[in-house]
Amino acid sequence: MFKDPFYKGAFKALVLIVLYVVAARYTYGVAPLLLVLVGCAAAFSGKSGRAICCYMLLPFTINISPMILPKIGILWPIALRFGTMAIALSLCFSASNRRGRNCLPFFGIVPFLLSACIGSATGWLPMVSYMKLVNYFVFLLGIWIGTQNLQERPRDLLVIRKTLFAMTAFIILGSVAMIPFPTISYATSLQNAMQEGGEVAAVAAYREMVLEGGKTLFCGIMNHSQALAPILALAFAWLLCDMLFVEKRIRLPHVGLILLAMPMLYMTRSRVAFVTLSASLFMIYFYTIRKIPIAYDVKRKIGVGMTLFIAVTVLAMAAFEIRDDAVSKWLRKTQDVDVDAQKYSLMEAMTSSRQGLMDYSMYEYRRNPLFGSGFQVAAYNREMLKGQGLVLSASIEKGVLPVMVLGETGIVGAVLFAFFLISFYVTASRRRLYVTITMFTLLLASNMGEASFFSPGGIGSVLWILAVCGGFTIDTILLNERTVRFSALRGEWPCGRLPPRAPKGF
């Protein structure tokens, strides 16, 4: 494996990520600050591939479990809150003269953000909403600028692909290493409950764990099970697409990470992530493969493999359900199926955890049907932050994405958000960004349980990077391959230029 140039480079990137996390743990925020400075320096020196890699590592750092990487010291919030903005603006200044059509179709979201600005003026916390709008806009701007015209920069393209593979490997292998230590997930769950609802929420979480026999939702190395689950689902899809459309053959490191991701996703007990993973198999086989031609024998092996996978999964689920109601326990998230079945139907049990958030979003919509109640804020934020002076940010939990958009931005925002989605899919389809379309659809699917679409300061940033940066990287590699084939047929390079020399492992 290490003789392969790509895997050799990815292993080096993995080692650097491990060293960075270790340094961040013991330097009290100095390492993330240095990462920001390195990213800015790389952007201004023209090494935008390294800059976007630093840009991707910052939100990844935010979501690592506080038991593994405690965020202690004043430098942490400075690096994490303003670091992404600094690197994004550096990329903007350094790439102002580098324009082209090969970029992500993000322009359609601008009208939606403008409508969110209008609605936030009369929302619960206008200052917080405006700061979150700026943060979200700069985050998307950094992704858009950093990935622009990657086909002209094959070395940057390779660096980004290696970093993405190393990040997914770190998350999956690191989470596997946490399986023998359930206390870490236990302590992480209690700490999250304490942060969200104080001592009352922590006591309630503890009682629920006791009732379920001391079991807790598996977090791996992330700060929450609902953070690990969608990341694993999108990592599964990206690794599969990378293996099929870039490597174009079965590769053991890819297969190993894919197989390790599935049982850990089951351990998180995230039903939405399981649906996202199932949707990834469906979309890749019935959409992406039909849009991107691959060898017949590879396609046949994929079909056989998917059939065997579905058959084994169904048989295993049936066996576990017959033996000890394992599937019912997983779907209902309870250890006593009989008692829970007397209170709720299966559909009620599966939607009960999100129903309150959906009802609350509809309450916010009725408060201001036209423009909503403010971008990424809620009424309870105002009560929790009362008397704390100038507040620039506040944590929030939202439910299903469509209802959240309706509650935050009203009818106008919902219509403009639908316009953004339509423009994204139409433009991406015209540009033949088929893997990006697949990954973006899975990003939307992962937001049907706990919406993180507008949360660049949380798990949403990692999902955006895996889905959009990861998908666009693969599409750009395929674009390069089509261009090379076109040049070979014509006997020349387009525009009279010599073809760029592809680096080893590309």
Regions found by a protein language model. Give the residues of each.
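A membrane-periplasm/extracellular boundary helix in multi-pass inner-membrane enzymes
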Residues: L173-Y186, T268, Y285-K343, Y363
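N-terminal signal-anchor transmembrane segment
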Residues: F2-S94, S115-T122, L443-N447
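Hydrophobic transmembrane alpha-helices and their immediate junctions
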Residues: M243, K248-I250, S278-R290, V405-L444
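Transmembrane alpha-helices of multi-pass inner-membrane enzymes
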Residues: A41-A42, L277-Y285, F420, T436-M448, ...
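Loop-to-helix entry and N-terminal half of a specific, functionally important transmembrane alpha helix
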Residues: C54-M56, L252-M262, I396-K398, F420, ...
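Long extracytoplasmic/lumenal interhelical loops at the membrane interface
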Residues: E212, T216, D338-T409
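Aromatic-anchored transmembrane helix interface
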Residues: P77-T84, F106-F112, A116, P126-Q148, ...
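Alpha-helical transmembrane segments of multi-pass inner-membrane proteins
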Residues: L113-C117, G142, V159-R290
